[in-house]
């Protein structure tokens, strides 16, 4: 009888949690409605490169400049469609913000997507097609691009290939050279483990070994040590990670299945398995010497996932015809747009959009 009551109690708790989740999704949808005569809040399925993909467009005035946000990974929709309602409250006053869950991940996850189409050239063309779609839709010549982490590989290459379509490019935690990135972060975590005298961590880190790695899973193993030394999230880590994780389940734009699949890293694994051989050999710092659009780098001082020192070196050598700025977020690691959200918004509005200093 006691076991029966326990089972009933567990079922009751699970049902209550499920109901609470559904109610919160309804609350979030209505509390973030855009009440503006020329506003837009539209979840849309479009075809890019022949593959169905999802975008979420939000803004209080469709005459505002268009800003496309590229999530990380590739294959990790952070910040993706699921983040839009919570993260863009200020930005939608000044931009028409477009979140895109890239092919193979988040709301655009589909195992039927041809594996051979998961490559950077195809992602660049997907983005180019998306920009064309938005230029026609909103009668604008150029759009702003804001990319984070793995999304910066796509964003920077697109800005170099199609400068005529892009008003300005912002790279947050800009990836450039995966081998160098992993070498610097490996040295960091090993030195921290030695500094703290943690022998077991030292042995575990040495077992991972130096790059190059034959699988993205080695990077995942390293990530937990980077995180433990605050090189992933420096400022309010529990709050930041809690927000990112819960977004997948609470977003009205995601079905529960889509949210759970994302939390289980289905899209990330699918994409990384297909792209790892290409990604591990990327050397944008050697490939790109100049750029024809205004370019900004937003870098967390303590970021050891994508070490800021590598971006500083690239910034110094980059020839930027229309100007370049490197902005360090003094209280952030890999997620300055979350760790110092207010400053991030102010910089996008006052510096990138309005051309301030």
Regions found by a protein language model. Give the residues of each.
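Conserved alpha/beta-hydrolase
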Residues: 90-109
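A catalytic-pocket lid/entrance helix-loop region that shapes and gates access to the active site
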Residues: 166-212
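Conserved acidic catalytic loop of the alpha/beta-hydrolase fold
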Residues: 122-142
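Catalytic histidine-centered segment of alpha/beta-hydrolase-like enzymes
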Residues: 332-341, 345
């Amino acid at each position: 009888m006691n076991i029966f009551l326990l089972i009933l109690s567990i079922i009751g708790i699970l049902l209550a949690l499920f109901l609470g989740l559904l109610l919160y999704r309804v609350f979030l949808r209505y509390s973030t409605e855009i009440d503006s005569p020329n506003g837009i809040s539209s979840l849309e399925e479009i075809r890019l490169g022949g593959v169905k993909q999802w975008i979420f467009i939000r803004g209080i005035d469709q005459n505002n400049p268009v800003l496309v946000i590229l999530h990380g990974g590739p294959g990790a929709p952070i910040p993706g469609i699921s983040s839009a309602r919570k993260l863009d409250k200020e930005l939608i006053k000044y931009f028409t913000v477009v979140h895109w869950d890239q092919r193979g991940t988040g709301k655009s996850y589909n195992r039927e997507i041809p594996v051979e189409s998961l490559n950077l050239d195809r992602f660049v063309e997907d983005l180019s097609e998306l920009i064309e779609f938005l230029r026609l839709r909103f009668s604008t010549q150029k759009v702003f691009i804001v990319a984070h982490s793995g999304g910066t590989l796509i964003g920077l290459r697109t800005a170099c290939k199609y400068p005529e379509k892009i008003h300005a490019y912002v790279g947050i935690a800009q990836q450039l050279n995966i081998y160098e990135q992993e070498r610097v972060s490996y040295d960091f975590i090993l030195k921290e483990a030695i500094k703290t005298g943690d022998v077991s961590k030292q042995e575990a880190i040495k077992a991972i070994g130096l790059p190059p790695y034959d699988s993205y899973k080695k990077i995942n193993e390293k990530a937990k040590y980077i995180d433990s030394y605050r090189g992933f999230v420096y400022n309010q880590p529990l709050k930041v990670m809690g927000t990112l994780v819960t977004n997948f389940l609470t977003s009205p734009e995601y079905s529960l299945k889509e949210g759970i699949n994302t939390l289980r890293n289905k899209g990330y694994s699918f994409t990384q398995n297909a792209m790892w051989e290409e990604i591990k050999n990327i050397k944008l710092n050697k490939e790109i010497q100049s750029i024809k659009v205004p370019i900004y780098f937003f870098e967390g001082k303590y970021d050891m996932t994508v070490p800021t020192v590598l971006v500083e070196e690239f910034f110094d050598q980059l020839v930027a015809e229309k100007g370049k700025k490197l902005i360090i977020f003094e209280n952030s690691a890999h997620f300055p747009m979350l760790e110092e959200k207010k400053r991030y918004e102010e910089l996008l509005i006052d510096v990138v959009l309005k051309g301030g200093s």
